[in-house]
């Protein structure tokens, strides 16, 4: 069993999303199956820029057209990242909320690996996923809550979760489970994170 653990917070030991994901992964290791954890930290990986060179390689790759040496180098790096998704049996993603969205490095990873004929297909009429991953867990972390009057009941607060969960289904994850962690700053942070870690342990048993 290969678990792809995507880390998108740069805060290390101070990160709520990393703390909750670690509790989940540690508990999942105790479920009896042999678990190989592949941790993909978007802040530590040497992610290539998705610039004109990468986009040029992308379109040549789709068209099976010859690439120059620089494009081949970028394309090999993209293929290496894609393979980590292709090899995964389960996915865990920790996503702190940044300005109602997600860390830009996570979006960079998504842009790099979301390649036609690698993670999805398109026949001119419809898209179809190429992965066959039974389930993923997304840990959504935000400092505010959806309590009445807190402001987080605005539909914009769903943007983060809707996008990440849609993308996972788009590439071939059958079931996307979510764990939302709120109040991750101030006096309530410690209790909120501990409750989320306890819930993560429970969820690991059925993952």
UniProtKB/Swiss-Prot annotation:
Assigned keywords, A-Z: Flavoprotein, FMN, NAD, Oxidoreductase
InterPro entries, sorted: Flavodoxin_fold (IPR003680), Flavoprotein-like_sf (IPR029039), FMN-dep_NADH:Q_OxRdtase_AzoR1 (IPR050104), NADH:quinone_OxRdtase_FMN_depd (IPR023048)
Mind telling me which Pfam families this protein's record contains? Flavodoxin_2
**In the record, what terms sit under GO molecular function?**
electron transfer activity; FMN binding; oxidoreductase activity, acting on NAD(P)H as acceptor; oxidoreductase activity, acting on NAD(P)H, quinone or similar compound as acceptor
Task: Give the reaction(s) catalysed.
Answer: 2 a quinone + NADH + H(+) = 2 a 1,4-benzosemiquinone + NAD(+); N,N-dimethyl-1,4-phenylenediamine + anthranilate + 2 NAD(+) = 2-(4-dimethylaminophenyl)diazenylbenzoate + 2 NADH + 2 H(+)
> Which Gene3D superfamilies does the record match to this protein?
3.40.50.360
Q: Which SUPFAM superfamilies match?
A: Flavoproteins (SSF52218)
Q: How is the cofactor bound?
A: Binds 1 FMN per subunit.
**Essential cofactor(s):** FMN
The regions listed as transmembrane in this protein's record are: none
Q: How does it assemble?
A: Homodimer.
Q: What does this protein do?
A: Quinone reductase that provides resistance to thiol-specific stress caused by electrophilic quinones. Also exhibits azoreductase activity. Catalyzes the reductive cleavage of the azo bond in aromatic azo compounds to the corresponding amines.
The protein's name is FMN-dependent NADH:quinone oxidoreductase 2
């Amino acid at each position: 069993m290969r678990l792809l653990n995507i880390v998108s917070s740069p805060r290390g030991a101070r990160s709520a999303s990393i703390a909750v994901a670690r509790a989940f992964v540690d508990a999942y290791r105790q479920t009896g199956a042999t678990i190989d954890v592949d941790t993909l930290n978007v802040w530590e990986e040497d992610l290539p820029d998705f610039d004109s060179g990468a986009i040029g390689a992308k379109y040549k790759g789709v068209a099976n057209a010859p690439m120059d040496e620089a494009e081949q180098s970028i394309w090999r790096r993209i293929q290496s990242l894609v393979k980590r998704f292709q090899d995964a049996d389960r996915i865990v993603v920790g996503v702190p909320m940044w300005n109602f969205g997600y860390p830009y490095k996570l979006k960079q990873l998504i842009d790099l690996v979301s390649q036609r004929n690698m993670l999805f297909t398109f026949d001119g009429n419809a898209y179809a996923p190429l992965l066959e991953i039974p389930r993923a867990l997304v840990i959504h972390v935000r400092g505010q809550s959806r309590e009445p009057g807190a402001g987080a009941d605005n539909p914009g607060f769903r943007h983060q979760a809707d996008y990440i969960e849609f993308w996972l289904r788009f590439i071939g994850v059958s079931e996307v489970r979510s764990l939302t962690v709120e109040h991750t700053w101030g006096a309530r942070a410690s209790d909120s994170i501990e409750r989320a870690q306890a819930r993560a342990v429970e969820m690991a048993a059925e993952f």
